[in-house]
Amino acid sequence: MNKKKKPFLGMPAPLGYVPGLGRGATGFTTRSDIGPARDANDPVDDRHAPPGKRTVGDQMKKNQAADDDDEDLNDTNYDEFNGYAGSLFSSGPYEKDDEEADAIYAALDKRMDERRKERREQREKEEIEKYRMERPKIQQQFSDLKRKLAEVTEEEWLSIPEVGDARNKRQRNPRYEKLTPVPDSFFAKHLQTGENHTSVDPRQTQFGGLNTPYPGGLNTPYPGGMTPGLMTPGTGELDMRKIGQARNTLMDMRLSQVSDSVSGQTVVDPKGYLTDLNSMIPTHGGDINDIKKARLLLKSVRETNPHHPPAWIASARLEEVTGKLQVARNLIMKGTEMCPKSEDVWLEAARLQPGDTAKAVVAQAVRHLPQFVRIYIRAAELETDIRAKKRVLRKALEHVPNSVRLWKAAVELEEPEDARIMLSRAVECCPTSVELWLALARLETYENARKVLNKARENIPTDRHIWITAAKLEEANGNTQMVEKIIDRAITSLRANGVEINREQWIQDAEECDRAGSVATCQAVMRAVIGIGIEEEDRKHTWMEDADSCVAHNALECARAIYAYALQVFPSKKSVWLRAAYFGKNHGTRESLEALLQRAVAHCPKAEVLWLMGAKSKWLTGDVPAARSILALAFQANPNSEEIWLAAVKLESENDEYERARRLLAKARSSAPTARVFMKSVKLEWVQDNIRAAQDLCEEALRHYEDFPKLWMMKGQIEEQKEMMEKAREAYNQGLKKCPHSTPLWLLLSRLEEKIGQLTRTRAILEKSRLKNPKNPGLWLESVRLEYRAGLKNIANTLMAKALQECPNSGILWSEAIFLEARPQRRTKSVDALKKCEHDPHVLLAVAKLFWSQRKITKAREWFHRTVKIDSDLGDAWAFFYKFELQHGTEERQEEVRKRCESAEPRHGELWCAVSEDIANWQKKIGDILRLVAGRIKNTF
């Protein structure tokens, strides 16, 4: 090492070092260092100046920043997250530590940027590829077409004509064409000038003229001159039919020429020409570029791994989709050579090949893969003769005797006796197949079937179907007492073998037994598994749900078994007895229902509804004394029951025992004086035309129950029937003072005033009623109808709009609004109504009537069915439905609607109640009321 060399040489100078400053030297410059002088207007060349000091503009900005001491620190320039928009320290000196801090921040930013760089670049690349895929360049769109230019020969290139100056000649020299229509007189004149000239103009004979001999002279008939054409006498009109025939003839000639051509490889069939054109349309919807990419990718996979079966299958299917079936066949056959042990490749090859070739392919596959079941199944499917199928399957069973699928396919082709023999062998080869054992048991006799099932249980002790089949076998042969034992033994045996008893699966098996007609088996299964896996407090609820589910699945015997078991567990539960009674009423016989009700009232004597159901069942069958005895027993169990009193009164009045009914009502008024008892007493006297007695009873009832609106309504209606309008008005007004929220009372009073002719008073009453009962759709509807009946349709529409604003979910208002619209707007209104009230029966009924008015019979019937299904208690829906069937249905449909209505027993509906509650119709049956209401309907909507 050189000791004379100073250690600081080659090192950077310390901060603030100025050369020569320590020895007192000062720097100086000469003119050669500065350069020549510049003019003030010359551009400043400060390229080598430090940033911020290069130009005059930079100096001005610096001076301005120095002069501008107060920054913009207003609230509008402040952000909670970023602070002020500008730097608070921009006017301060930029020192070394600031530079170091900026370098650290820059390094951090660079580091963070590098961490996300790969993911960001990948995302940007995917976005660019997606954009290029959605919006490819024109160059990319025509790239596949440009590749075909390589196939153009040099002669074809040279034969392309030069464009020359004609390229833009029309644009450079515009020529304005004038098109003038030819007058009709021109065509008429030339069509009529078809005469022959019989003389020669003398001017034509000068200079030798036409008579001068001329080689092939002009007198010689000119080719085409005398043929049909210009010399043919004109007819005055064009024959378009002949023009069409000529065009067809020309097309036939061209097709014939092509079909007779032998220069090409194919010959065109004229008859199938258009069909062939349609078949040439490609069936795939992918882009041609995507197909080419997929083809290249699959080719690469095949070359990289030629023993990969999915690559060959995918390649063949790609060619098949693109319409190149022969290429697909060639590829898949090459695949069978490269992958001879792949079952999927052989099956795909058999699928792509035509019939005979496919058989050969399958035969070759069997030689390579003699143990594969699907190949044998495919071979059997390719055979058309039953004997050939049997031969193939038997050959397959020689190689694969333990295949259940092959045995099943072979047995299906045999006759019953041969199938039984084959199944005997099948269960030996496949002893764990439940299906084969059960199939053999079905074909055997009773004794042999029992032996077969016993062997099946020995081989498969964990399957429930064998036990259930054994129970069904015993039931089918009359041994019903064994069914219960077999099912109980099955539960015990399965649990002993570690099988979990799945309650849902057993219930499904019971439903299948029910549908198959094995009633005892399904009931035994239900009794055995109904209580498994259920908490004690959830039993009742779960069992009722199970019963409903069975009814929905049409497994009625299963539901009956559930109710029977539930009644044994809960004998004192009224709700269970009621559910069972309703089930028996809908799905059982009258005798079973009455027996059930007798047991029910014995366990639940306080359940009034059970007594009433029993009495009604007897009454409907015409056994009035039995109904009376049931009600007498009900009185003993429920001495002061209003329902039983009224049921007894109805029974006597319906059978014309009016004195008995009066005595019963008198006893009821003394022992159980309720408002309904008084109301029935008044109505009985009213319908018997004992007006005075009815009025006295009504006054007595009102002294006890003045807040019961139906009594006031009956009082007013009796006065109205006697034409005592003032007294009727007074009765309604008194009733409204006591019952201001009774909508029927308001309606009766308003209709009374309208009947008298006091429209102004009617409007006032309805407005007052709406104030006392806001959001009441019935009152709004009556107000709208009042204006409509008065002929003020504009006011009616205005009121309807207000009503829908106050009651936007009212079905009766929407149904009325539909038919207030003009016919073209009704459909739109009905759509709005369905959006607001999708499941309201009034809206559904209005839609059905709308379809009816448009003569869309099928749709109208569908909507009527939907209406009565949603609300079977709406009598108006049944009446309109019955009227519809009277006009457009058969007698069977009419009878069906009537019977369904009688079973539903509707009680509500505006038109229905107007007829059913009329005093003149008090003894009418449901069917009679239905006919009366339907007779009043006029389909003028």
Swiss-Prot record:
Q: Where do Basic and acidic residues bias regions lie?
A: 39-65
Example GO molecular function: protein-macromolecule adaptor activity
Q: Provide the protein's localization.
A: Nucleus, Nucleoplasm; Nucleus speckle
Q: Which residues carry this modification: Phosphoserine?
A: S143, S279
Q: Where are the HAT repeats?
A: 384-416, 418-444, 445-476, 554-586, 588-620, 622-654, 689-721, 723-755, 855-887
What InterPro entries does UniProt report for this protein, alphabetically? Answer: HAT, PRP1_N, Syf1-like, TPR-like_helical_dom_sf, TPR_rpt
Q: Which residues carry this modification: Phosphothreonine?
A: T180, T266, T275
Q: Which Gene3D superfamilies would you find in this protein's record?
A: Tetratricopeptide repeat domain
Post-translational modification here is noted as: Phosphorylated by PRP4K during spliceosome assembly.
What the entry lists under Pfam families is as follows: PRP1_N, TPR_16, TPR_19
What is a single cellular component term in the Gene Ontology annotation?
Answer: U2-type precatalytic spliceosome
Q: Which SMART domains match?
A: HAT (SM00386), TPR (SM00028)
Q: Where is this region: Disordered?
A: 1-79
Superkingdom per UniProt = Eukaryota
- Which Gene Ontology BP terms does the record give? mRNA splicing, via spliceosome; spliceosomal tri-snRNP complex assembly
* Role: Involved in pre-mRNA splicing as component of the U4/U6-U5 tri-snRNP complex, one of the building blocks of the spliceosome. Enhances dihydrotestosterone-induced transactivation activity of AR, as well as dexamethasone-induced transactivation activity of NR3C1, but does not affect estrogen-induced transactivation.
Record note on quaternary structure: Identified in the spliceosome B complex. Identified in the spliceosome C complex. Associates with the U5 snRNP particle. Component of the U4/U6-U5 tri-snRNP complex composed of the U4, U6 and U5 snRNAs and at least PRPF3, PRPF4, PRPF6, PRPF8, PRPF31, SNRNP200, TXNL4A, SNRNP40, DDX23, CD2BP2, PPIH, SNU13, EFTUD2, SART1 and USP39, LSm proteins LSm2-8 and Sm proteins. Interacts with ARAF1. Interacts with AR and NR3C1, but not ESR1, independently of the presence of hormones. Interacts with USH1G.
This chain belongs to the protein called Pre-mRNA-processing factor 6
Organism, scientific name? Pongo abelii
